[in-house]
Amino acid sequence: MADMARLRQVEDAWSAMEAAGIASEVVPVTYMNSSADIKAFCGRNGGAVCTSSNAETALEWAYQQGSKVLFLPDQHLGRNTAVLKMGLSLDDCVVWDPHRPNGGLTTEQLRDAKMILWKGHCSVHGRFSEETIPELRAAIPGVQIIVHPECKHEVVLGADLVGSTEFIIQTVEAAPTGSAWAVGTELNLVKRLAADHPDKRIVFLDKTVCYCSTMNRIDLPHFVWAMESLVEGVVVNQIEVDEETEKWAKVALDRMLALPGKTHKD
């Protein structure tokens, strides 16, 4: 997902907003799943970082700063939060496609929009289909559908509950014995919930198996190697960014941490 919003692309989009005369009204908000330079871009331009837990709070703050929001890189989290939590309509939202001239939008569309969504998505959550929901309801009487807000808007509308990873875990854990759940999020989490709660029926929402290849890069052998290296005083695979990027990315992150309520849990 982070690779779907490159700094040069975002800067080009910002230039188009400046040309349309709206950049001064736009507050950029980036999902935590983004690169350091995109976070720094938001910090430099009066914006902030958010997680799936605090996206609503972050947008409330952003709309106090300006009349429009550029939300990146996950269009689905931005759309679901704007429409279902903030009271915006789908017509208030436009999608900026970095691979099309002027994002595929007219100047009028940019000026009319309240939410400018970046055309990016999670490769796992984007696979879930609203067509699966009635099939599961028919196959498992009384099943509750719970999904992550990175899912498509149509999937979220068909679900019973929508919330962050933390919300999904807490909801399923607190559910009564014998309850049935179809969960729309990363498969490893669903399998872990099912293993930890054998008294409940917990199934994956998708028909096919789709692991998050990015998360699966963190495997046990490499984790052990990294930890053992630290014990020996050796730092391996250290990620470094330049001071300017670090400075402005931290500004955006600090703005998030200063928001009220739960602001740092996903």
Which positions does each model-derived feature cover?
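Active-site loop-to-helix "anion-binding N-cap" substructures in soluble metabolic enzymes
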Residues: 1-147, 151-183, 190-266
